[in-house]
From Swiss-Prot:
It comes from Janthinobacterium sp. (strain Marseille). This is Large ribosomal subunit protein uL6. One of its GO terms (molecular function) is structural constituent of ribosome. PROSITE patterns: RIBOSOMAL_L6_1 (PS00525). InterPro entries: Ribosomal_uL6-like, Ribosomal_uL6-like_a/b-dom_sf, Ribosomal_uL6_a/b-dom, Ribosomal_uL6_bac-type, Ribosomal_uL6_CS. The gene is rplF. Part of the 50S ribosomal subunit. Keywords: Ribonucleoprotein, Ribosomal protein, RNA-binding, rRNA-binding.
Amino acid sequence: MSRVGKMPIALPSGAEATITAAQITVKGPLGSLTQSLNGLVNIENDNGTLNFKVANDSREANAMSGTLRALVNNMVNGVTKGFEKKLTLVGVGYRAAAQGDKLNLSLGFSHPVVHQMPQGVKVETPTQTEILIKGIDRQKVGQVAAEVRAYREPEPYKGKGVRYSDEVVVIKETKKK
C-alpha cells in the first residue's frame, strides 16, 4: 500500500461520511461533496476515522489507495474549512470587480473580460487589484483560479498580468545594445 494511503483520516466534529459501494459522500457545515469509487480500494468508517484498504496487491490498487485518500482528505477539509485562492492584478489600469457569480476584468484588452463562476465557487474582490476565489471543492477553486490567470499571465519583462498572491515572477533583464 502507498504511504499516503496507509494514513487514516480523522473526521472532525460536524463532518460525517457516508460510504456506499459506488461512492463516498462527505457532509459538513459548508456543504457536501461526493466522490465515485472503483473496486480497487475499500473504505471503512471506524467511529469517525476513515481507513483505506486495497482490494488486491496490484500496482494500480496501491496507486489508487493514495490517490483516493488524498481526494477524500481534500473533501473533508473542504466541507469543514473550505478552500481559497488569492490572485493579484499587476499593471496600469488592470481592474477586477465581482458582480454576483460573474467576475469582470479589465486587463488591457479592447473589451472587458467577463468570467462566469461555476456552481459552488464564490468570488470576492476586496480591492480592485485583488481577487479571492472561495469554495468547498479544491479542484474547482484551483481550476477557476488557473482560468482567470490564463487571461493575462505575468509577462517576464515587467511582471504585468494576473498572478497568484504567493507566486514569484522572475523578471528578465532587457536586451542591451
